Amino acid sequence: GTWSDDTSMTLCLADSLSRGLNYNDIMQNFLKWFKKGEFTPFGSAFDIGNTTRQALKRLEQGAAPLECGGNTEYDNGNGSLMRILPLLFYLQSVYGREFYQEDEAFAVIHKVSALTHAHKRSQIACGIYIAVAGMLLGEMNLKEAVNLGIGKAMEYYQNQEGFVEELKFYNRLKDKDFADLPSESIRSGGYVVSTLEAAIWCLLNTENYKDCVLKAVNLGSDTDTVAAVAGGLAGLKYGYTAIPQDWLGVIVKREYIESLCNQFYFAITR
């Protein structure tokens, strides 16, 4: 029932967004997590990624929050993708259910990624993920929602200078037979493209929350992050009540997490 950096950084973002969108405030929460062990199950930060660590070091050295993120090809780990989901609810509260029609909404996604991961490839992963997540809250069937979310994000990026060159890395997601790929061809390491692919593949190949998360874990490699990213989507599709009670019962600091989530919900819906 313990949890790692994925959950901690997601809670950091949700807590900060409760007070509105402030990039410095988000980074200060990340620092509180890394330096003081806040937003953790046992009072100390666990398993921080290298790109995130470097970004926080730059912040401490005086860099502006939006100048901290790594922007080289080697900075495309899954560290911004794994924490981005709370932003969906903020964007819907500001721009409405069709936030993906707004360039400004994508700009916010990219900036929240860029706090730690500023390369266009990581930003695209976050954009696709948030677009798919938004569609899962609608009435469409699973496959339709996923395809429409991917399609809307691709549509946006195809017209964006600097991003269009990176789209080729996401070609497999556009393939109508993507869900039918065998598990051996799904990579589940720390590379952001692999993590996004694995999460969507697990979602498309299962029919409930529990099976989706277990499939992600069973892919091996970066299991906590792939399961967190896949579980985020499955949670939106199947709802809170679909999470197995025996899993919820053993979560460390469950009341703390639920209270922070409630605070976030009330802040963005008031």
Language-model features, listed with the residues they occupy:
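Structured, active/binding-site neighborhoods that engage oxygen-rich ligands
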Residues: 1-270
